[in-house]
Every structure is written in structure tokens, then in C-alpha cells.
């Protein structure tokens, strides 16, 4: 819960201030809408997600399974763009808010008052930690979250005491509220319209699912139950704090103090801590807030380093160096610096972009749950939840389009890099292992000299006579001894959007013809992998026989990259050339 909390609970550092700037005196009512959506929409939704992805893959993996082939891969890239937006803005927003707490602390040195500079220094320190090597420390998270929640409880309790000691505050707030909004229905309607601006208070649910592999449980069912307890506990704690902090900050802090560069801007609870508990306690609160916000940035960086290598290299859509964390750290920090500069390290300005990333991920989870439920009656409730989040996301993007712009940049960058990487990596071997069935091994053992000769061909519904004719033509063309065994190898093309696979080869006879059969996303790479495996098993260099493929070479190359097929002979040779370094062990390719 505390690993989830460094992301989720740390938003208390800036959520009350952003809520007031968005909703004004309606902030408590708009926050109540947020709490209701948290408990009765997001929570049941992610309880379903936890059940569907017990290993922590979350909604992205659910949708990848639901949408096969290239459509699913493109969908994953789009969601990764929004997820990257979420994590990057978590880093920059957390660092900016930590800087705001530092700058407005009365003990801060006068020569270090630039919020931009401090934000960049915090981001630099974060990158330095990861460049040295960083492992999430559950113990640190427990200490930080425990202290932070305890301090917030103290400040909130004292602030509520101030409200009770000054009973005129609530009637004054009601008079001002009704002066602006004469009817209760009008207040509710406007709160529903304003709620999307507060949606960054929904962060943490994806993190809660992501930490599932760390949750104790004797089996998967118990882990799912414990995760659901975690989500419930975190949501209830956060809802209580969101509601109470919204009330006390609205009643006790003058509206002008929330404005840009105001003492309560981005640090409403810290302002109350200094105001009612003194600068010493307030400084302790500031330090606690700065630490948990910094750790929230570290959690976001860890999320990025877990998310990107999990998907892009596996799909062949990232360079090999993307598997290493340090180059990725430098890339992410460069982007974080740019985003910080673009938003001028302003906490409020980044709220919309952050909410966009959070809302798109939650909406994608809602869609995944609805689709996974099929025709069950329960899906109607989740369809309503999905409609709520679609509305919330659309309104947030309409009013604060900067989040969509940043996400679009990430999406276009990922798609561009992915296409280039997929093309450049297409002639890698891509076959993780070759599994020869007993039938295939028995047929191969019949070759007396164990110099295996393979005729590579596309699977077709041909008779034994057709195969006999093809074999005679190949033997005549290449002058093969009639006693030499020849095998047909047929590769049935599978999902071409997959990058790598295990090649399972079966043996089959049709008349006197021996046929090796396999299914794979890529034809040429599978032929190369089989030849390498045959050389390893027999100790002799195998031979493969091809027929030239007619057609445009550029079109053939395109078909190979995206459809897994093309002119197999030169492509197989190129895959072998890259995979086999010793020319004495290089299988021989014949083509005519």
C-alpha cells in the first residue's frame, strides 16, 4: 500500500490547491463528486482489473490480449504514450511541487528562491540515483508514507478544530456559495462539469495493480484478494483526506492566497501547517512532503523503466539499448527537463496534462473490463462506469488540451521509433528456441549421412504426386544423388505482429515425402532457425533450396517487416549471416 501511496497519497501536496483553483468555493462539492467516483467507479473497476491481471500487467496487457495482431500492437503504443505522459508528468509535477514547498519555507536560503532551478536540481538528483542503480525500497516507502499521513492527520485535525472554534466560517462560506450559485441543482451541475479538473486525485490505481507481484499470497486467488484489500484501503484513506483537506483549505485560506506565486499555491496543507502549528512543525511537514514527492518521482521513473522494456523490445519496436535502464534514464530525464521548461515548473499548469494521462489509462481499463465481461448482466454497470470516464476524459482534454498534445508527441515518437526499430531488427533470428517433435526427429534420423537437405516452400493443399514432381525438379536442377534424403519444410504464417516465438517443428509423411511443419510469425527467420538447429544437432552443414520470388523488391521488404513474408531466399541468408559468426558452420542457401 505504501508503494502505491508514494504516488497516490503524495497528491495531497497539491490536490487541495488545484481543486480550489478549479472549483473555487465549490471545491468541497466537486471533491465529493471525485470521492464518489473513486469509491463507486474507479475502485470496483480496478478490483476487476486485479482479477484479470494477477501478475501486475494492468489494463494495457488486458487490451493487448483482447485486440490481436497489429491492431492490438498499435493500441498498446497509444496507451503507452498516455502512460508515459502520466509517469513523466508525475515526475515533473512532483518535483515542481516539492520545489514550491522549499521556496515558500521561511527557513529557505534567500539565494535559492528559483522554483525552476530547484525543480531541475531535484530531477537531476533523481536521474543520478537511477544512473547509479536504484531498487524500490519498501521500507523507505513505509516510513515516508506513514510519517506523511500522520502529519496530514495532525494538520487536518488542528484545522478542523479551527473551523469549530470559528463557527461563523461555515455560514459565511454558504452565503458566498449561494451568492455565486443560487440553486443546489446548479451547484451539483457545475461540480459535475468541474470534476474532471480534479481527476488527478484518481492516480494510484494503476500503481496499485502494478505492485501485485510484491503482494503476499499463497496462490493467485489470495494475491488477488489481498490486492483488492489494498485498493479498498488506499481508496478509503485517500477519500477521507481528500474530503477533509478540501473543506479546511476552502474555509480557512483566503482565495487570493491560492493564486499563482501565492503562499498557498500548490501547498495548501503546508500553509495551514505553518499558520496553525508554527514554522518548526511546518518545516517538518515541508520536508516530509518534499521527500514523498521526490519518492513519487522515483516511483514514476521505476514505472517507466518497467513499462517500456516490458513491451517495446518484446514487440521488436525498440532498439536493443532500450533493454538497458541507464540510456532510458537519460532519455526520460531529457524529456522531463523539456516538460518542466515548457510548463515553467508551474504545478497548476501541469495538472491538466497529468489528469489526461491518468484518465485515459482508467478509461482504457474500463473498456477492457466491459469487453472481457462479454454478455454477462454485470457489464451494464461497468458500461455506465465507462461512460462516466469517457465523459470525464473528453471534457478534460477539451478544456486542458496540453495533456493530449504531450501524449500525442509521445505516441508519434513511439510509433516512429517502433517502425524504424522493427525494420532494423527484422533480420535478427527472432526464434527463441526450436522444439523438434518425436516424429520430426525420427524422420531426420533416417538421413544416412546426416547432411540435411531442406526444400523450403509455402504450405499448399498438394497431393503426394505434386510433391514428387517438385522433388524431382529440385534433384535435377541441383544434381542431387537419388539416394540423398530430401525434406520439405513448410512454415504456416501466424500472427505477423509478434516479434519472436518458440518454433515447434512436427514431422508428417505424404506418400514417400517427408514434411517438416511449423507455425511462426516470420517465415525466413524460422527457416534460418531450423537450419541452425540442424547444424547443431548433426554437426554437419545443412542445405536449403529456394525458388526466386517474383515481384517488387521494395514491396517484398515491406511484406517481410510487417507481414512476416517476402522473398525468403535472400532474407534467410541475411538472417543466417547475422546469427552465425563462423563461416564453417553457416548453412548453405541454394536459389534458382
Where are these regions (language model features)?
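Extracellular loop-to-transmembrane helix junctions
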Residues: 16-64, 71-76, 92-122, 147, ...
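A generic transmembrane alpha-helix motif of multi-pass inner-membrane proteins
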Residues: 351, 357, 368-456
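Membrane-interface "cap" regions at the ends of multi-pass membrane proteins
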Residues: 1-14, 63-65, 69-77, 188
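Extracellular/periplasmic helix-exit of transmembrane alpha-helices
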Residues: 157-170, 220, 233-269
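Cytosolic C-terminal regulatory domains/tails of membrane transporters and channels
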Residues: 429-592
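Helix-loop-helix junctions that connect adjacent transmembrane segments
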Residues: 146, 153-203, 398
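Loop-to-transmembrane helix boundary motifs in multi-pass membrane proteins
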Residues: 69-73, 112-121, 216-241, 309-344, ...
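Flexible loop linkers connecting adjacent transmembrane helices
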Residues: 44-71, 96-106, 136, 172-173, ...
Amino acid at each position: 500500500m505504501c508503494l502505491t501511496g508514494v504516488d497516490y497519497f503524495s497528491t495531497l501536496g497539491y490536490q487541495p490547491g488545484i481543486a480550489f483553483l478549479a472549483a473555487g468555493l465549490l471545491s468541497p462539492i466537486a471533491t465529493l463528486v471525485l470521492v464518489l467516483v473513486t469509491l463507486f467507479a474507479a475502485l470496483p473497476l480496478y478490483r476487476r482489473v486485479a482479477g484479470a491481471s494477477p501478475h501486475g500487467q494492468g489494463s494495457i496487457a488486458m487490451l493487448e490480449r483482447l485486440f490481436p495482431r497489429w491492431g492490438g500492437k498499435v493500441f498498446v503504443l497509444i496507451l503507452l504514450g498516455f502512460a508515459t505522459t502520466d509517469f513523466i508528468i508525475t515526475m515533473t509535477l512532483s518535483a515542481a511541487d516539492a520545489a514550491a514547498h522549499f521556496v515558500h519555507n521561511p527557513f529557505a536560503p534567500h539565494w535559492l528562491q528559483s522554483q525552476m532551478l530547484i525543480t531541475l536540481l531535484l530531477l537531476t538528483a533523481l536521474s543520478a540515483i537511477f544512473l547509479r542503480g536504484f531498487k524500490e525500497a519498501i521500507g523507505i516507502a513505509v516510513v515516508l508514507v506513514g510519517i506523511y499521513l500522520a502529519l496530514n492527520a495532525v494538520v487536518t485535525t488542528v484545522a478542523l478544530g479551527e473551523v469549530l472554534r470559528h463557527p461563523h466560517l461555515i455560514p459565511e462560506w454558504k452565503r458566498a456559495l449561494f451568492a455565486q450559485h443560487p440553486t443546489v441543482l446548479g451547484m451539483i451541475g457545475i461540480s459535475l462539469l468541474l470534476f474532471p479538473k480534479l481527476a488527478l486525485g484518481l492516480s494510484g490505481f494503476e500503481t496499485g495493480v502494478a505492485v501485485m507481484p510484491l503482494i503476499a499470497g499463497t496462490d493467485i486467488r489470495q494475491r488477488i484478494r489481498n490486492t483488492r484489500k489494498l485498493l479498498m484501503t488506499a481508496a478509503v484513506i485517500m477519500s477521507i483526506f481528500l474530503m477533509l483537506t478540501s473543506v479546511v483549505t476552502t474555509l480557512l485560506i483566503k482565495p487570493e492566497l491560492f493564486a499563482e506565486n501565492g503562499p498557498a499555491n500548490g501547498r495548501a496543507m503546508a500553509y495551514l501547517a505553518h499558520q496553525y502549528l508554527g514554522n518548526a512543525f511546518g518545516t517538518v511537514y515541508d520536508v516530509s512532503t518534499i521527500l514523498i514527492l521526490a519518492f513519487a518521482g522515483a516511483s514514476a521513473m521505476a514505472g517507466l523503466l518497467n513499462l517500456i522494456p516490458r513491451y517495446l523490445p518484446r514487440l521488436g519496436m525498440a532498439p536493443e539499448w532500450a533493454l538497458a535502464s541507464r540510456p532510458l534514464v537519460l532519455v526520460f530525464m531529457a524529456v522531463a527537463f523539456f516538460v518542466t521548461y515548457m510548463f515553467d515548473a508551474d504545478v497548476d499548469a501541469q495538472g491538466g496534462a497529468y489528469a489526461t494521462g491518468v484518465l485515459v489509462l482508467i478509461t482504457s481499463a474500463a473498456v477492457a473490463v466491459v469487453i472481457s465481461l462479454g454478455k454477462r448482466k454485470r457489464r451494464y454497470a461497468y458500461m455506465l462506469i465507462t461512460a462516466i470516464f469517457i465523459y470525464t476524459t473528453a471534457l478534460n482534454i477539451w478544456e486542458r488540451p496540453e495533456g493530449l498534445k504531450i501524449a500525442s508527441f509521445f505516441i508519434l515518437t513511439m510509433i516512429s521509433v517502433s517502425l524504424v526499430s522493427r525494420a532494423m531488427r527484422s533480420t535478427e533470428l527472432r526464434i527463441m528456441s526450436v522444439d523438434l517433435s518425436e516424429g520430426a526427429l525420427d524422420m531426420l534420423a533416417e538421413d544416412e549421412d546426416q547432411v540435411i537437405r531442406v526444400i523450403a516452400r509455402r504450405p499448399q493443399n498438394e497431393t503426394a504426386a505434386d510433391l514428387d514432381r517438385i522433388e524431382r525438379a529440385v534433384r535435377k536442377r541441383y544434381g542431387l544423388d537419388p539416394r540423398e534424403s530430401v525434406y520439405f519444410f513448410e512454415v504456416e504464417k501466424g500472427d505477423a505482429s509478434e516479434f519472436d516465438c518458440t518454433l515447434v517443428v512436427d514431422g508428417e509423411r505424404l506418400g514417400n515425402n517427408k514434411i517438416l511443419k511449423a507455425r511462426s510469425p516470420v517465415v525466413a527467420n524460422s527457416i534460418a532457425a531450423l537450419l541452425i538447429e540442424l547444424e547443431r544437432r548433426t554437426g554437419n552443414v545443412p542445405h536449403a533450396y529456394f525458388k526466386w520470388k517474383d515481384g517488387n523488391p521494395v514491396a517484398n521488404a515491406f511484406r517481410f517487416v510487417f507481414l512476416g513474408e517476402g522473398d525468403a531466399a535472400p532474407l534467410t541468408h541475411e538472417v543466417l549471416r547475422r546469427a552465425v559468426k563462423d563461416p564453417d558452420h553457416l548453412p548453405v542457401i541454394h536459389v534458382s
